[in-house]
């Protein structure tokens, strides 16, 4: 990222602490530049295995091994017009399979937010979650989410609930034990009211209309304050 900033000067801003990114501005357009990563150093992981700093730069081969899902580990070379696939990601896409690279338990420990990403991708793409993930994705392992900062957890939750498939993902949030980590004081139950609002939210997103996430949270709390 520092080298990118040296090239673009004031038009570049480095963001992120856990993983630095370079934001390059060209007029009104924003281009996000991510540098290839190498395996993290032991010293920057928490007691539960969560990666606290991931700014160890490396090669494309090292970077591919650091990706979370196979479908996120493909690289496009625009000048040559080719896609580099090191992990049979194309097969996973054709078979509509969501697969983590490496040991799923270790990948969740490295970054518990990957649990939310698992549900988001599965619901949005209508992919089947790989059996190796299902074996370890228990309500107990969701306790790892308690180590995630509230700000990051909120951001990832927003992506989960505003992707246009809220009706599909809500039952998954309950079944996989995520609900109790996000809404500790709300009963894990999809009422007809919540289902109606979720359906309406999805429809508005699909129609290109704006939504207010606060409205959905208000519906979740409706029974609490009646």
Residue positions per predicted region:
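Catalytic cores of the polymerase beta-like nucleotidyltransferase superfamily
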Residues: 1-226
